[in-house]
């Protein structure tokens, strides 16, 4: 049986019959706000009812909680530029557009100017513009607009066969008879290390929800459609079909490390997962976060506050002496016997058509990735 959503109720802010024709004011959304609008509307970000007011925004900073008390670690905000902010006021109802088309409305409760340097250091642990999350933060508008939203129109889906809302995943898990479901978040192809921890987790639960992020990522990440092909190849060849469910997570990647790990877990709870895999440097980038810092942040909260059970895994690798996948917990041999490649190194190999060793990744997966990247699919 799926867990109760975060906050106890699955939010539904969808009203496709909403009459917005009389509303003159509009805010044009960027890619991140566009995906956030829909994810709020369909309940993936429950208990959020809209973009954060200053009260919730500050509470997330100070307490890693919403002002109502629920654990929440990332600000979900609607930035506008100063010129646009001058034309808005609390009490206004404003259309939310993307590429000129109306997808929702916001009832403005609050308009406020954040201290972005403080936000960067609090959320990303740095204010360096080399960090992709920090750069994105400073590239966005300097004023935030808060208030409840109504989702009037859903976006056109890049992967319609693999796009499911929380109500749908919960129904699917029930139909499959799964009482315990482990969620796995990734923005990367699934190599043997991921396969190992997924299958280790699968030994202890009824089903695996493979939930790759397909929203906005940094420019050198593998494109989502190439990754999706590689996931399908792997699942078709190496996973039991009745124990795995593939569905995409259409959010933007924040690269906020530990705080994003908590956020990712809470969202998967809303999708119906009971467990969530937290590996090494979850949602990390570069060397900004400690290897197991994300796992440690879960320990700052009582289990019932998070509600979903984190499954913490050590860094896994192939050991040439053991002749199998292992971690430091199970392998006594030195690093010289371990097959470990960085994500940066693997991406460079793939783009040059070079095959990483089969002990690192399934050959069929590598073939799919190289072919997709060579075709320039994005």
Curated annotation (Swiss-Prot):
The keyword ATP-binding applies. It catalyses: sulfate + ATP + H(+) = adenosine 5'-phosphosulfate + diphosphate. It is an enzyme of class 2 (transferase). One of its GO terms (molecular function) is sulfate adenylyltransferase (ATP) activity. Keywords: ATP-binding, Nucleotide-binding, Nucleotidyltransferase, Transferase. Pathway: Sulfur metabolism; hydrogen sulfide biosynthesis; sulfite from sulfate: step 1/3. Pfam families: ATP-sulfurylase (PF01747), PUA_2 (PF14306). InterPro entries: ATP-Sase_PUA-like_dom, PUA-like_sf, Rossmann-like_a/b/a_fold, SO4_adenylyltransferase_pro, Sulfurylase_cat_dom, Sulphate_adenylyltransferase. Its EC number is 2.7.7.4. GO terms for biological process: hydrogen sulfide biosynthetic process; sulfate assimilation. Belongs to the sulfate adenylyltransferase family. This is Sulfate adenylyltransferase. It comes from Bacillus licheniformis (strain ATCC 14580 / DSM 13 / JCM 2505 / CCUG 7422 / NBRC 12200 / NCIMB 9375 / NCTC 10341 / NRRL NRS-1264 / Gibson 46). The gene is sat.
